[in-house]
């Protein structure tokens, strides 16, 4: 069997930069799936991508499928031949479909009878005959939201295709992909070197392209850009503002990266740096430079796609491009400052939050009220929280935010400071949107937390209250993110907030706007608590631990988290799973036998020392356990409950719960009910998996 490396490249016009990596990965994944389905052996597979190409490299691909021995069971002998011993039409048809006569068929004998059997060998197909259809199928499965046609062809793809290269080692695999016949021709850089060249061998792909000013390896190109930008920043005694999303996008825009440094007028630094950074990063794909004091410098790094003989001309061109954008930001900032945030409240009446839920003005009123309620729960300044909630959406009406939507919140903070608002009020206007994404920072003050939670709860209650519950991947109001935000802030900031109180207060604030109020409180709370599952699974918390706590439905997120920590620790104890098993047994017994009064334990009905021992042990720890529950010291609760291990084991080993005497039986059930009640103070540990 011959093994070679396969190179497949689809040469296109410039591909969408934000989608490039996903497209290339999907291309490789789809082709890998096709190879696996066809049972073609290979060692590994990787992808390459640049603005004008998607490529897949399969290492150690077999030249053909392995031959297979096949067996096909035919009709039973009893129906394959008639009374005279002649083959029936059913037998003849089956034999013909397998390319044999009935006489050539073998026999398969089992304890259930005898059947005709065909044994043969299926020759493996050549990779050259299989690949074109595989590649065509892999491309058709790409996640392309909107395809396009070009020329007079009806063929569609994300961008027009110019070349298709399929090399198995040094051999061209013939085929027609997306209307283009395969060849060994590769497009080089658009401006440097030869426009096209011929690739002699699949193994030469990266080196040949690099010789023609194309770094086809996305990861290598990204690393080079990172290194160049960091080196340029160091020369300026600064650090580049460089996140992975921007780095990926710039990597997808260039084939031969060259980092250069440019500047803008210092006067623009009077504008809040967030607006300038947004303009540079999001609009122009530049890397802003931050000095050692965390301040924005009037210098930036950009990455060009050519190695120019006159880099100053390119630098000058980029400086001319950024200047009017920064001038716009400066104009918006200076214009916006002439109008206070408070005076923009009226304009919020013209903007709908949601048709049934009213305007942003109404939403800000609700946020203000709920933020004040939360601040009161946190023993924080109610007036500051209410004020921040009231002004929370006013910056949406400023020129700056209308032009650069991503600076909402942070511009509200700057404008609030200019207006003379309290520092905590101004800070809350920025931090109200935190956390914006997974792993994002949280609000830093109680006032900010109050506004952030109020905003999220208002959205959750409102959207649920009009029946627009998220379904599948559809979540247009980002309710899942809002729920996770409420949980993260409450848990990580250790806030003593009860979702029941918050949700009910929010429901009341909507008046008659909500149309789906039946069980609304429970629906919203269950939805929020349901986000705990994914959150804790990401932290590698066992699912049964999460279920054990969720079964008790604690509605204080910080309290929920404390219980999770305690149950996880309890499960790791030697006695933990044993007591969990005993609790499961107790739960099963009590499910079949209702106990009306757990306080009716009568020691005079004890017939065994083990009953008395368990009763005494529970009495000894009951007061301490209840005190620990009040203090939310759930690990302390389990430490006390763990002391019951031996007593519980001895009880079940020596006592028959379902005694014939009804009074004795009910007394023992009451004893078990009390045991169960003690454990349920924290979680339903009967759910814990005994196999882990």
UniProtKB/Swiss-Prot annotation:
State whether keyword Metal-binding applies: no
Gene Ontology cellular-component terms for this entry are: cytosol
Q: Which SUPFAM superfamilies match?
A: Anticodon-binding domain of a subclass of class I aminoacyl-tRNA synthetases (SSF47323), HD-domain/PDEase-like (SSF109604)
Where is the protein situated, by its record's location annotation?
Cytoplasm
- GO terms for biological process? arginyl-tRNA aminoacylation; glycyl-tRNA aminoacylation
PROSITE patterns registered for this protein in UniProt: AA_TRNA_LIGASE_II_GLYAB (PS50861)
State the EC number(s). 6.1.1.14
Q: Does the keyword Nucleotide-binding apply?
A: yes
Gene3D superfamilies per record: Isoleucyl-tRNA Synthetase, Domain 1
What GO MF annotations does this protein's record show? arginine-tRNA ligase activity; ATP binding; glycine-tRNA ligase activity
Keyword terms of this UniProt record: Aminoacyl-tRNA synthetase, ATP-binding, Cytoplasm, Ligase, Nucleotide-binding, Protein biosynthesis
Q: Which reaction does it catalyse?
A: tRNA(Gly) + glycine + ATP = glycyl-tRNA(Gly) + AMP + diphosphate
Which InterPro entries is this protein grouped with? DALR_anticod-bd, Gly-tRNA-synth_bsu, Gly-tRNA-synth_heterodimer, tRNAsynth_Ia_anticodon-bd
| Lineage top rank: taxon | Bacteria
Assembly mode: Tetramer of two alpha and two beta subunits.
Its family remark reads: Belongs to the class-II aminoacyl-tRNA synthetase family.
Indicate what this protein is called per its UniProt record.
Glycine--tRNA ligase beta subunit
The organism is: Pseudoalteromonas atlantica (strain T6c / ATCC BAA-1087)
């Amino acid at each position: 069997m011959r093994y070679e490396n396969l190179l497949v490249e689809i040469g296109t016009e410039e591909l969408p930069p934000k989608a490039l990596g996903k497209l290339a990965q999907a291309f490789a994944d789809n082709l890998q799936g096709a190879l696996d389905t066809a049972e073609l052996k290979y060692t590994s597979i990787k992808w390459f991508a640049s603005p004008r190409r998607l490529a897949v490299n399969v290492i150690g691909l077999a030249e053909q499928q392995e031959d297979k021995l096949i067996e096909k069971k035919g009709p039973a002998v009893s129906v394959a031949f008639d009374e005279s011993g002649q083959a029936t039409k059913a037998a003849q048809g089956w034999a013909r479909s397998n390319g044999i006569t009935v006489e050539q068929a073998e026999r398969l004998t089992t304890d259930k009878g005898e059947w005709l059997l065909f044994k043969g060998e299926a020759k493996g197909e050549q990779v050259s005959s299989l690949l074109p259809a595989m590649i065509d199928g892999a491309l058709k499965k790409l996640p392309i939201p909107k395809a396009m046609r070009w020329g007079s062809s009806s063929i569609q793809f994300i961008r027009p295709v110019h070349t298709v290269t399929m090399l198995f080692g040094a051999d061209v695999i013939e085929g027609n992909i997306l209307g283009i016949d395969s060849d060994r021709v590769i497009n080089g850089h658009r401006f440097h070197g030869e426009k096209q060249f011929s690739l002699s061998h699949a193994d030469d792909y990266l080196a040949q392209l690099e010789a023609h000013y194309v770094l086809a390896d996305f990861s290598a190109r990204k690393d080079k850009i990172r290194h160049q930008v960091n080196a340029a920043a160091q020369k300026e005694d600064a650090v580049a503002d460089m996140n992975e999303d921007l780095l990926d996008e710039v990597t997808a825009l260039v084939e031969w990266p060259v980092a250069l440094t440019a500047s803008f007028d210092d006067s623009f630094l009077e504008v809040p740096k967030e607006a300038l950074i947004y303009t540079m990063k999001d609009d122009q794909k530049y890397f802003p430079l931050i000095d050692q004091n965390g301040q924005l410098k009037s210098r930036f790094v950009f990455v060009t796609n050519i190695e120019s003989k006159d880099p100053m001309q390119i630098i000058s061109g980029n400086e001319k491009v950024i200047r009017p954008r920064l001038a716009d930001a400066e104009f918006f900032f200076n214009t916006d400052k002439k109008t206070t945030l408070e005076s923009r409240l009226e304009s919020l009446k013209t903007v709908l939050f949601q048709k049934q839920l009213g305007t942003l003005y109404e939403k800000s009123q609700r946020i203000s009220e709920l933020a004040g309620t939360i601040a009161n729960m946190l023993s924080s300044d109610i007036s500051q929280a209410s004020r921040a909630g009231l002004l929370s959406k006013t910056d949406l009406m400023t020129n700056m935010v209308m032009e650069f939507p991503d600076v909402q919140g942070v511009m509200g903070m700057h404008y609030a400071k200019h207006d003379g608002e309290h520092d905590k009020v101004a800070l809350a206007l920025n931090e109200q949107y935190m956390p914006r994404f997974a792993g994002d920072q949280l609000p830093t003050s109680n006032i900010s937390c109050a506004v952030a939670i109020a905003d999220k709860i208002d959205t959750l209650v409102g959207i649920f209250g009009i029946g627009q519950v998220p379904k599948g991947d559809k979540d247009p109001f980002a309710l899942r993110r809002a729920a996770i935000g409420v949980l993260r802030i409450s848990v990580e900031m250790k806030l003593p907030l009860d979702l029941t109180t918050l949700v009910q207060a929010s429901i009341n604030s909507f008046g008659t706007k909500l149309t789906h109020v039946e069980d609304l409180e429970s629906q919203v709370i269950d939805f929020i608590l349901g986000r705990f599952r994914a959150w804790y699974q990401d932290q590698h918390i066992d699912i049964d631990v999460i279920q054990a706590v969720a079964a008790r439905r604690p509605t204080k997120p910080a309290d929920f988290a404390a219980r999770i920590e305690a149950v996880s620790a309890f499960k790791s104890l030697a006695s933990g799973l044993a007591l969990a098993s005993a609790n499961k047994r107790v739960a099963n017994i009590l499910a079949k036998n209702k106990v009306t009064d757990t306080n009716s334990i009568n020691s005079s009905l004890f017939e065994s020392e083990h009953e008395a021992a368990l009763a005494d042990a529970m009495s000894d720890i009951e007061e301490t356990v209840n005190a620990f529950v009040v203090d939310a010291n759930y690990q302390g609760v389990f430490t006390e409950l763990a002391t019951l291990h031996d007593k519980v084991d001895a009880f079940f080993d020596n006592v028959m719960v379902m005694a014939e005497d009804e009074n004795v039986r009910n007394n023992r059930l009451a004893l078990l009910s009390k045991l169960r009640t003690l454990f349920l103070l924290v979680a339903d540990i009967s759910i814990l998996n005994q196999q882990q």
